């Protein structure tokens, strides 16, 4: 996040939490993930598109080893109910239902993650990864990305079935 984001984070708790996640994952990268072969050396750590949704902070975290959509409790918000680490949770977003895995992150607390990319070797540059993260976060929060439901099948009553009239309808629709 840039300097302007830091100013906004003073007002927006979701952006502030995104910055905290960035700092925490930078620490992890510098320590536990240093020299781990699944890390893409072209990437750094960034939080993208953090916003408040359903009383939680949601956004995308990009690291040299993953890109995840994450949901975390806001510091001054109402905490979500308990969830055992590794539990699959379904969250309704504007673009549809998304599965998250419940987890814990030191210095943050409960953080639920939906893996988008892991590992992240398909990204040659951090700019490419951030463009993907920005587009993904837009898609998750855009109801227009929902696929339209399939058309209901033509109703066939028993009389039409016995007379064979349903065949003509199927052939006409093809």
Curated annotation (Swiss-Prot):
Indicate the transmembrane segments per the record.
none
- Reading the lineage from the top rank, the first entry is Bacteria
Q: A Pfam family name for this chain? A: NiFe-hyd_HybE
User: What Gene3D superfamilies does UniProt report for this protein, alphabetically?
Assistant: [NiFe]-hydrogenase assembly chaperone, HybE
Q: Which family does it belong to?
A: Belongs to the HupJ family.
**What is the name attached to this protein's record?**
Hydrogenase expression/formation protein HupJ
């Amino acid at each position: 996040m840039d300097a302007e984001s830091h100013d906004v984070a003073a007002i927006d708790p979701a952006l502030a939490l995104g910055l905290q996640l960035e700092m925490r994952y930078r620490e992890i990268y510098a320590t536990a993930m240093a020299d781990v072969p699944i890390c893409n050396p072209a990437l750094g750590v960034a939080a993208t598109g953090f916003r408040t949704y359903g009383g939680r902070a949601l956004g995308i975290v990009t690291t040299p080893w993953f890109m995840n959509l994450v949901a975390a409790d806001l510091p001054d918000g109402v905490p979500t109910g308990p969830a055992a680490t590794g539990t699959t949770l379904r969250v309704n977003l504007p673009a549809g239902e998304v599965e998250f895995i419940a987890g814990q992150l030191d210095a943050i607390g409960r953080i639920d993650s939906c893996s988008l990319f892991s590992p992240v070797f398909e990204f040659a540059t951090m700019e490419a990864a951030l463009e993907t993260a920005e587009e993904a976060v837009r898609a998750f929060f855009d109801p227009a990305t929902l696929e339209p439901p399939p058309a209901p099948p033509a109703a066939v009553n028993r009389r039409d079935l016995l007379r064979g009239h349903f065949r003509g309808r199927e052939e006409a629709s093809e």
